[in-house]
Every structure is written in C-alpha cells, then in structure tokens.
Swiss-Prot record:
Name of this protein: Transcription factor RBF1
DNA-binding segment(s): 160-300
UniProt entry keywords in alphabetical sequence: Activator, Chromosome, DNA-binding, Nucleus, Telomere, Transcription, Transcription regulation
Lineage: Eukaryota, Fungi, Dikarya, Ascomycota, Saccharomycotina
Any GO molecular function: transcription coactivator activity
Family: Belongs to the RBF1 family.
Position of the signal peptide: none
Role according to the record: Transcriptional activator that binds to the RPG box and to telomeres. Involved in the regulation of the transition between yeast and filamentous forms and plays a role in virulence. Induces expression of HWP1, a major hyphal cell protein and virulence factor.
Amino acid sequence: MSSNKNQSDLNIPTNSASLKQKQRQQLGIKSEIGASTSDVYDPQVASYLSAGDSPSQFANTALHHSNSVGYSASAAAAAAELQHRAELQRRQQQLQQQELQHQQEQLQQYRQAQAQAQAQAQAQREHQQLQHAYQQQQQLHQLGQLSQQLAQPHLSQHEHVRDALTTDEFDTNEDLRSRYIENEIVKTFNSKAELVHFVKNELGPEERCKIVINSSKPKAVYFQCERSGSFRTTVKDATKRQRIAYTKRNKCAYRLVANLYPNEKDQKRKNKPDEPGHNEENSRISEMWVLRMINPQHNHAPDPINKKKRQKTSRTLVEKPINKPHHHHLLQQEQQQQQQQQQQQQQQQQQQQHNANSQAQQQAAQLQQQMQQQLQASGLPTTPNYSELLGQLGQLSQQQSQQQQLHHIPQQRQRTQSQQSQQQPQQTAHGLDQPDAAVIAAIEASAAAAVASQGSPNVTAAAVAALQHTQGNEHDAQQQQDRGGNNGGAIDSNVDPSLDPNVDPNVQAHDHSHGLRNSYGKRSGFL
C-alpha cells in the first residue's frame, strides 16, 4: 500500500505541477497584460483534464487539488475584475472632469462675448445720443437765425414807430398807437412787483399814455389805458371819484395782460408738498410773469410832452398848525431861550470889562510904585506938587485904559498877559540899575521946572508927556508883536514930522514948550 502511495505521489506531481505552472503562467500574463474577463479559469475543465491524465486510483486526490487550484484562480480573476472596474471608474471621472472644464470655458467665452456686445451697444447708443443732440443744436441755431430774420422787419417797424413817438412834432389829430403789435410779448418778469413797476414807470412814458390796472388776479393782471373809463383811484369821496372817472372816460380799447407761468418743477411739487426741499420762497422766485399786448390801438391823441403836472415836492411841509395854542407855547419857549442867551452874553461882557478894569488899576498901581522906587533911588529932591502929578498920572492911565478896553477887549487880554510876562523878567533882571527913559525925562522936567519956578502945571505937563511916551511905546510894541515885527520902527502919525526921529518925540515936544532946543545930545544917551 505504501509503495503504491509513493508511486502515486511521484506520478501526480508531474501532471499537476505542469498544470499549476501553466495556470500560474496564464494568471501572471493576465495580470501583467490586463486580460479581459473572458479568459477566466474553469474548474470543471481543469478537473476533466486531470482525470483524463491521472489513473482512476488517484482520482479523489486530483479532484481535491483541482478544487483548491480553482478557488485561487477564481479569486485572482475577481481581483482582476475589481481592478478593471476601478480603472473604468477612474476613466469615467477623468472624462467628466474634462467635460466640466470644457463647459466652463464655453461659459467664459459666452460671457466675454456678451460683455463685448453690451459695450458695443452702449457705445452705439452714446454715439446716437450725441448725434441727436448735435442735430437739435443745429435745428435750434437755424430756428434762432430764422426768428432773427423774421424779427428784423418788426424791429425796424418798432424803431420807426419809436422814433416817431420820441420826436416832439407829432400830429395831434391822429390816434395814438403802441409800438408793440397785437399778441406780442413785451417782457418777462420774476415777480408781480417788478411787473407793476415796469408798467407804471417805464412802459407808460414810452407809450405816451397812463396805464392803470383794470383787475388783478392771482395768476393774471389786466392793464388798460387811463381813458378807458373804469380804473382804480385813491379818492375816498364817492362824488369826487365819480367826477374824476367821468372826466377821463373815453372808452379807449388799449389793453395789456400779464399771465403767471409756473415752472414744471413747481407743478410736480404741488402733488408732493411734504418734500423737504419744498419752499414757498423758492416757488415765488421761480415764477415767471409774461406781459403781452392785446390791443395796441388807442382812440385818442397822445398826451403832449410839455403837459403841466402837479409837483408834490413843491408843497411845504407843516408839522403842526400855527393857530393852535401849542404853537404859541413853542414860540414863547424860543423867545425865552433867546432872551436867556442874550443875558448870558451881556453878563460875560460885563465880567470881561470888570476884569479889564481891575487889571488896568493893578497896572497903574504898579506904575506908581515903580516911579516912587525910581525917585527914591535917584536921590533927587521932591517937588511940592509931585503927589498931584502921580494922582493925575493914575487918572489919565485909567481913562485911556478904559477907552482901549471898550474897543479892543479881546486884544487887551493877550496884550496884558504879554506885557506882564515881559515886565516881570525885565523888572527882576534889570531892577534899579537901568531906569526908564520916560521917567528920567519926567524927573528932569520937574527939576528944571523947580529951578525955573514956573509952577506945577509945567510939571504935570511933563508927567503927562512921559505917560504918553510910555503908552505910545507899549502900543507900538504890541503892534510889532501882532504883525510879527514887520513894521518895527514906524513913527506915530500924530507926531509932527519936523521933529528929530532919533529923539523921543514926547521929550522934543516938552523941550520945545520950554525953549530947550540944543539939549538933544545930552539926553540921547538915556534913550
């Protein structure tokens, strides 16, 4: 039995091994090349082949081996089929992706083409709009030229009528006619006030008639000639108003009308008044009044240019009536104020005179003191009538100062101030070292009179001459100060021209009265 088994073992592998190798080779070739599913291993065929080759005793073992080999072959075939299916799915996915990419590219191309078409269409529309606007401008320009050409004869006609109206020579027998034709637009305005002002102040004088308002409505104002019969007037009395109306009633057919034309925006805003931009003032500003001629023909002659008109400015304006008691009260107040002003002026003049008199008295007292001091310092003998001489000098100085104050009160203040300002430094500077020439002349005259025993009248005459000399010198000095020193050195007109100009004229007169003609050289040293 054992020997038979060994033989069978030795015999079987030869056939089975060859079969397995063949099967493995076939499976390897299929796996490498990727054979189709038609080359599948059949276990029945394999078992039939093995049974035909092997003997009958070994039939069971051969079938067992063939079954195992068949299962492995079927597994390999299933794996190959799965791989083939996976590859097919991968290929299908690749094809789908390619189709999607192709579709996306087509969509992009379509969109680009559509955008280009839209841009071209928009450009064409813009070009058409520009062409349309250019054509409209050309049409408007042509219409404007045509209107100007058509208006030229009308303008020439209006200018001719205007020239005829502006000339002073016009036929009073012909009826007045406007320079505007029927249904012609005269002018446009932005407000009703401008319209009325133009018609009243400009159009009326140009038309040689007075234009009045017949009726006024919110959207229309009707104008007519004053002589048409019914018009507005400011006369309150009914009888006077009726008389004025009848005097000017002539049934004139001259008519004008002004209509209000609101803008389209205002019409739209009326439907929506709640908008924030809606404003009544803006709507008023945007309104437009159009003045149009209805009937340019009058039935009367034009008013003459030199027509006498009542001048309102020539009337005198009276604030309150004169006959009322209040006016008398005002007049009395004015008179009282004038009297008070006069009294104040008189008081001021009296105060000025009083001040001037007091200043003159002070000056006279100062002069007397100076003379007494100079006499005491000179050491000359006093005369019995020297006190009378001083009294007469004071009285004469007061009289002359009063006369000068009556005629030259305003000048006296300046002169006294300048004299005081000049006398004070002179007195402090010079003192008794340099005596006055007039005082020395008076002292010498008094001494000579005492020696000659001619009495007190000569002494007084000498003193008077000395006083006149001092006053004349002061008067000349004041004139020189007022005139700026231009007439310095002028001789008084009251002095005799035969006197020596180098010697004091008062001293010369005194010497002539005493017969002293050859003593000028001695006294000239004191001058």
